[in-house]
Amino acid sequence: MSTNNSDIRVVVGMSGGVDSSVTAHILKEQGYDVIGIFMKNWDDTDEFGVCTATEDYDDVIRVANQIGIPYYAVNFEKEYWDKVFTYFLDEYKLGRTPNPDVMCNKEIKFKAFLEHAESLGADFVATGHYAQVKKVGDEIELLRGVDNNKDQTYFLNQLSQDQLKKVMFPLGAMEKTEVREIAKKAGLATANKKDSTGICFIGERNFKQFLSEYLPAQPGEMRTLNGEVLGKHDGLMYYTIGQRHGLGIGGDGEPWFVVGKDLKENVLFVEQGFHHETLYSDSLIATDISFTTNAAKPKTIECTAKFRYRQTDTKVTVHLREDGTAEVVFADPVRAITPGQAVVFYDGDICLGGGTIDTVWKNGAKLNYVG
């Protein structure tokens, strides 16, 4: 790089975890002008001490002091509520299964946070995501992280060129074990901290209990597709396509799985057997299609896709439609595609972009996954 790194200001999103701690440490070691920012996205004052925000910020302070960088906490609660949490609840009301991580990256970490960082004179923002960016001509490509088990491009699929041109992912070329090793060698306070899992604003709390605080549950009948009533469900929002646990159906034979929802009648459909035919589909319609590059796209794209995080890729043909949606046709049937989740497109290691799964189809007929 022709410019001296000390002239380049990088604002790091620090969560109090090991990944973002090592990100800040690496950039500081490389001579960048580094500032750490802790994003406070959720108001935990009305909770019962479960949220770890204060503890996490203490860890940010400890690490920032260890590596010698300034740090701040910035409140994005309003933006998070408006852009992420409201979407989260709206999707559940529609009987779908949302992906708040995708929306958080699009609207908070690489929008509200990026704008704030720029107000501090940032040339780039950096996070602890396991993904890579690569300049090719005038464009920035988003590439999978080297650690296949940790690759997070699935959650970054909605990022635009304007956002990608401003980001650094120092951990993208590393395995998670290397990151822990660096943290230990550097003596970082978070070196042995457990990775956070699940949805950040729910934390360790019971999911059903949390959701019922915001959306009234409406119990109803649990039926087979032939109309046989097998019991009661606790509320359609608590169930997702392909779910097995928590159905409370006894008896012998193969386990039961969720195969559909009827919102109007408030009925949950279940069938027996992991490989029940209703769980398999051959295509889907996706909305909110977004691409990571500005290059012109052909109407038909042959690529691979992921329908959930850490799933192996499936060969697909994507047909872009005039209304901004896409029909995604699978080379082989896929099990338990879930409306509301992200479908993400890849060309080898390049993440092309993605969209939101809206409807799921088989042999030209729409499956009643949410209807």
From Swiss-Prot:
Disulfide bridge positions per record: 104-200
Residue runs in coiled coils: none
Region Interaction with target base in tRNA, annotated ranges: 99-101
Tagged with keyword Lipoprotein: no
Molecular-function annotations in GO: ATP binding; tRNA binding; tRNA-uridine 2-sulfurtransferase activity
Active-site residues, Swiss-Prot/TrEMBL: 104, 200
Classification via PANTHER family: MITOCHONDRIAL TRNA-SPECIFIC 2-THIOURIDYLASE 1, TRNA 5-METHYLAMINOMETHYL-2-THIOURIDYLATE -METHYLTRANSFERASE
Name the record gives this protein: tRNA-specific 2-thiouridylase MnmA
Natural source organism: Listeria monocytogenes serotype 4a (strain HCC23)
